[in-house]
Swiss-Prot record:
GO terms for biological process: proton motive force-driven plasma membrane ATP synthesis. It comes from Polynucleobacter necessarius subsp. necessarius (strain STIR1). F-type ATPases have 2 components, CF(1) - the catalytic core - and CF(0) - the membrane proton channel. CF(1) has five subunits: alpha(3), beta(3), gamma(1), delta(1), epsilon(1). CF(0) has three main subunits: a, b and c. HAMAP family: ATP_synth_gamma_bact. This is ATP synthase gamma chain.
C-alpha cells in the first residue's frame, strides 16, 4: 500500500490537472460562442448570393456556367477541413474515417483523388496515407479569414474550371449543437441546378441590369458562392472543434474529481491503518512492561 505522502502527492497532481482542464473547458466554451456567432453571420452572405444567382439563372436559361458543368468523373478533388490542435475527442477521427471510405470507394472505380488540406490534423493524415496533395493551409487561428483560405482552395476551383478535375468534394464537421457534431462529405462542384432554383415568393420580382453581361456576373457570383460555402464549412468546423473540446475537458475534469475522491478515500484508509498500528504498538509495549 502506498504511503500517505505518496497519496498526498498524487492528489495534488490530479488537482493541478483538474485546474488546467477546467480552465480549458471555460476557454473552449467562450470560443465556441464566438465561433457560433461567426457561423451564423456567414450564412446570410451565401444565401443572398444564391438568391441573386437563382434569379439571374432563371432570366438566362440558356447559359451553363463553368461551375455547373457535368462530365464523366475520372478524377475528383477533395477539400479536407480538420483542426490544427487536438484535445477535441473523436472530432477529427470521424471525418478522417469518411475520407478513408472515400479513398476505398473511388479506388475501386479507378478514380484519382487530389486533396487540399485545411488544418494540421488532416495534413498529417494525408501525408501518412501518401495521398496526392495539391495545396494546404494550416495554423489559421481561431478566426478564419478568406484571404488565408483562398490560396489553398483556388487550386481546386481552377483545376475544375480547366477540366483537370471532374468533381470537388468538401469534408468537414457540421455543427449541430454544443453536444452533437456530424462529419460530412458533400459534393461541392459541379453545383446542382436544383440548389440554385429561385424560391417562390410573393411580391415584386427583381429585374437586374448586368454590366458587362449576365454571364460574366453569373460566373463571378458562383465563384463567390462556392468560396462562401467553404468559409461556412470552416466556420462550422471551428464551432464543432470548440464544442467538442469543451465536452472533452468537462469529462476530464469530472474524471479528475472522481480520481481525487478515490485517492482521498485511500489516504484516509492508509492514515487510519497507520494510527491503528501505532496504537497497537503502544498498547503492546505497555502490556509488556
Amino acid at each position: 500500500m502506498a504511503s500517505t505522502k505518496e497519496i498526498r502527492s498524487k492528489i495534488k497532481s490530479v488537482q493541478n490537472t483538474r485546474k488546467i482542464t477546467k480552465a480549458m473547458e471555460m476557454v473552449a466554451a467562450s470560443k465556441m460562442r464566438r465561433a457560433q456567432e461567426r457561423m451564423r453571420n456567414a450564412r446570410p452572405y451565401a444565401e443572398k448570393i444564391r438568391e441573386i444567382v437563382a434569379n439571374l439563372s432563371k432570366a438566362n436559361p440558356g447559359f451553363r456556367p463553368a461551375y455547373m458543368a457535368t462530365r464523366e468523373v475520372k478524377k475528383v478533388g477533395t477539400i479536407l477541413v480538420t483542426t490544427d490542435k487536438g484535445l477535441c475527442g473523436g472530432l477529427n477521427t470521424n471525418v478522417l474515417r469518411l475520407i478513408a471510405n472515400q479513398v476505398r470507394d473511388l479506388q475501386e472505380k479507378n478514380i484519382e483523388i487530389a486533396y487540399t488540406a485545411i488544418g494540421s490534423k488532416g495534413l498529417q493524415f494525408l501525408n501518412r496515407s501518401k495521398a496526392k496533395l495539391i495545396s494546404q493551409t494550416i495554423q489559421i487561428g481561431d478566426i478564419p479569414h478568406m484571404d488565408v483560405l483562398i490560396g489553398a482552395i483556388v487550386s481546386q476551383l481552377e483545376a475544375f474550371e480547366r477540366g483537370e478535375i471532374d468533381a470537388v468534394y468538401l469534408a468537414y464537421t457540421r455543427f449541430v449543437n454544443a453536444m452533437k457534431q456530424e462529419p460530412v462529405l458533400e459534393k461541392l462542384l459541379p453545383l446542382e441546378s436544383e440548389a440554385l432554383t429561385p424560391q417562390e415568393k410573393t411580391g415584386n420580382s427583381w429585374d437586374y441590369i448586368c454590366e458587362p453581361d449576365a454571364e460574366s456576373i453569373l460566373n463571378g457570383l458562383l465563384k463567390r458562392y462556392v468560396e462562401a460555402m467553404i468559409y461556412q464549412a470552416v466556420a462550422e468546423n471551428m464551432a464543432s472543434e470548440q464544442s467538442a473540446r469543451m465536452v472533452s475537458m468537462k469529462a476530464a475534469s469530472d474524471n479528475a474529481k472522481n480520481v481525487i475522491g478515490e485517492l482521498q478515500l485511500d489516504y484516509n484508509k492508509t492514515r487510519q491503518a497507520a494510527i491503528t498500528k501505532e496504537l497497537s504498538e503502544i498498547v503492546g509495549g505497555a502490556a509488556a512492561v
